[in-house]
């Protein structure tokens, strides 16, 4: 019966639904004409703001402050997330620049620029019996740092010629209205709605997933109706898939080696490697909508994020259970 439970695990169901949304985008694509009945794009915009509002409401400031003393672990995780990842991809910038594969490289760099995922990092660390408090701290703080770092890192390589001052101002406005303002509002309302959020945390988590599924559906609908995938050859898909898997293993083992050099204990090593090697599908999906990425390229940016997210869930789930068994 355990194999049945694994198949119907919440994360596996979500991955299955992601695939379903891609299929729906092909078979029943959402078209602009449907906006007169239901404006999906506006609903997603409000949903993005809602996710970050809830993120602010769920953030436990006391937990964050209490665990700040474990600074070596926190620094290593954030350096892995926002320095090591982008640096590894940047090594291939010279190869991709000026070629038809530059957008492919940029989509992988976008993945590398994202913050760590929140929920699955904490869950996997818990399964492997790592330092859960530090996992919560890093998962939370990574999302906040990502609000600044992801747009900053991407700004160095996104086309400047096609974006005038007005479009740059619009990107900043979108980030402020859809990301920063909701988080600040959530933090201010945290003391009032803390108990409510804790009580209904399971249902609140489902809201995140619904918005992500809708973003995937809308993006792939546009991609299929505008024939975007004609530009994604099997060779490009293989490059993206291999790059995602290689990135994970390189970062994971570099962080594990550094943990050994710093004499981290078992629990801190688990937390560092698990949190530092993860990338957030939530933030990836949301940043695609607010960074001024052209409509016809959104799917190309989303593809590496979805591949990496799927791989990290399946592999790290297996790895966490193996580490837990070895500890007993």
Question: What name fits each language-model region?
Answer:
Residues 250-259, 302-328:
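Membrane-helix cytosolic exit motif
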Residues 92-99, 286-292:
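Hydrophobic alpha-helical transmembrane segments of integral membrane proteins
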Residues 93-149, 154, 158-171:
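Membrane-interface helix-loop-helix junctions at boundaries between adjacent transmembrane segments
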């Amino acid at each position: 019966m355990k194999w049945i439970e694994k198949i119907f695990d919440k994360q596996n169901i979500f991955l299955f639904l992601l695939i379903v949304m891609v299929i729906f985008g092909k078979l029943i694509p959402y078209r602009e004409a449907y906006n007169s009945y239901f404006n999906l794009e506006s609903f997603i915009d409000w949903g993005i703001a809602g996710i970050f509002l809830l993120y602010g409401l769920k953030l436990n400031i006391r937990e964050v402050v209490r665990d700040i003393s474990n600074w070596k672990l926190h620094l290593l995780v954030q350096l892995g997330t926002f320095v090591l990842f982008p640096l590894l991809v940047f090594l291939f910038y010279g190869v991709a620049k000026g070629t038809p594969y530059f957008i492919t490289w940029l989509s992988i760099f976008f993945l590398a620029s994202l913050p760590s995922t929140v929920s699955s990092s904490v869950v996997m660390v818990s399964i492997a019996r790592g330092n859960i408090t530090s996992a919560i701290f890093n998962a939370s703080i990574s999302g906040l740092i990502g609000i600044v770092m992801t747009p900053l890192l991407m700004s160095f390589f996104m086309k400047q010629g096609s974006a005038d001052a007005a479009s740059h101002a619009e990107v900043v406005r979108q980030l402020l209205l859809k990301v920063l303002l909701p988080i600040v509002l959530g933090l201010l309302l945290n003391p009032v709605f803390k108990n409510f959020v804790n009580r209904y945390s399971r249902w609140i988590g489902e809201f995140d997933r619904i918005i992500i599924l809708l973003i995937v559906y809308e993006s792939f609908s546009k991609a299929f109706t505008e024939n975007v995938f004609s530009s994604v050859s099997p060779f490009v898909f293989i490059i993206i898939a291999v790059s995602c898997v290689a990135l994970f293993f390189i970062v994971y083992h570099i962080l594990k080696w550094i943990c050994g050099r710093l004499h981290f204990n078992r629990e801190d090593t688990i937390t560092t490697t698990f949190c530092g090697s993860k990338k957030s599908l939530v933030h990836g999906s949301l940043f695609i909508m607010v960074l001024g990425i052209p409509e016809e390229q959104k799917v190309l940016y989303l593809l590496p994020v979805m591949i990496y997210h799927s791989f990290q869930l399946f592999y790290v789930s297996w790895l966490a259970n193996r580490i837990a068994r070895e500890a007993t």
